Amino acid sequence: MARILDNDVMGNEEFSDRTLRPQYLHEYIGQDKVKEQFAIFIEAAKRRDESLDHVLLFGPPGLGKTTMAFVIANELGVNLKQTSGPAVEKAGDLVAILNELEPGDILFIDEIHRMPMSVEEVLYSAMEDFYIDIMIGAGDTSRSIHLDLPPFTLIGATTRAGMLSNPLRARFGITGHMEYYQEKDLTEIVERTATIFEIKIDHEAARKLACRSRGTPRIANRLLKRVRDYAQIIGDGIITAQITDRALTMLDVDREGLDYIDQKILRTMIEMYQGGPVGLGTLSVNIAEERNTVEEMYEPYLIQKGFLMRTRTGRVATQKAYRHLGYPYQNT
């Protein structure tokens, strides 16, 4: 069963990220601190006629890291070439990409923490001094070739900044921590999306939808699509607060934005392990999910909302989790 709160990109669905993506900083809703900083750094680079320093964007999935990379490129008026860590399997793959860059271009690497170390090491001299040395041939006939690169900006995006090596992380002069969105910003995003796609929704409905979107624009837009379907078939096509409540209840998305998998995690901890501590591996087996999936997709929001704690001995369900799910709490 597909997870309605899944953060995966929506592919060819109507509400594509590309269609909804703002083009410039003034169009970008939320992330005010990051926007304020980037506006200064971008303007300074333009006045000096220099490439922007390398940028690392990090935070949970679905918070607009890719969108921010495109916005930076538009603000600078430069081209952006896009790839991802898993797609760059060999050093030669990265060399080919770097060799195509024009002065001032942006190279955007999504999931940069998943690059192989052999590939990552090629970036060190490229980022610091704009050159690469590559070996061609084998054995006694091998030789090193020095390639100068034009000044460029590398933008790396990651959900796991802690997995970056120290040498790579140190070469990013600018960092942007993308945080979960506030309710008012998500409400504005929902209303903007509704306007773009000519969906009739009242303000209270947009606010309710925003409250249950896990602080994540991608999820808010996906839920809007599902609620629109519900309103079209069950109602008169207009999304009201009542329609929103009924649709999200049908989708098992509760008032805190937790879906059936989030609730399954917490119920498993409470019912089987007295609230914990329980190890991540054990918990993952019990709910039939991959360990990395639990750690990267589910835990951050549960922790941020105060339902879950990470301790040295394992995961622990909080008193708030007990209260939210209707379990009596015993402080052991």
Swiss-Prot record:
Locations listed in the record: Cytoplasm
Presence of keyword Transferase: no
Example of a GO MF term: ATP binding
Alphabetized InterPro entries for the sequence: AAA+_ATPase, AAA_lid_4, DNA_helicase_Holl-junc_RuvB, P-loop_NTPase, RuvB-like_N, RuvB_C, WH-like_DNA-bd_sf, WH_DNA-bd_sf
GO biological process: DNA recombination; DNA repair
GO cellular component annotations of the record: cytoplasm; Holliday junction resolvase complex
SMART domains given in the database record: AAA
Small ATPAse domain (RuvB-S): annotated span: 182-252
Assembly information from the UniProt record: Homohexamer. Forms an RuvA(8)-RuvB(12)-Holliday junction (HJ) complex. HJ DNA is sandwiched between 2 RuvA tetramers; dsDNA enters through RuvA and exits via RuvB. An RuvB hexamer assembles on each DNA strand where it exits the tetramer. Each RuvB hexamer is contacted by two RuvA subunits (via domain III) on 2 adjacent RuvB subunits; this complex drives branch migration. In the full resolvosome a probable DNA-RuvA(4)-RuvB(12)-RuvC(2) complex forms which resolves the HJ.
Domain-related comment: Has 3 domains, the large (RuvB-L) and small ATPase (RuvB-S) domains and the C-terminal head (RuvB-H) domain. The head domain binds DNA, while the ATPase domains jointly bind ATP, ADP or are empty depending on the state of the subunit in the translocation cycle. During a single DNA translocation step the structure of each domain remains the same, but their relative positions change.
Entry similarity comment: Belongs to the RuvB family.
Official protein name in the record: Holliday junction branch migration complex subunit RuvB
Organism of origin: Streptococcus pyogenes serotype M3 (strain ATCC BAA-595 / MGAS315)
Gene: ruvB
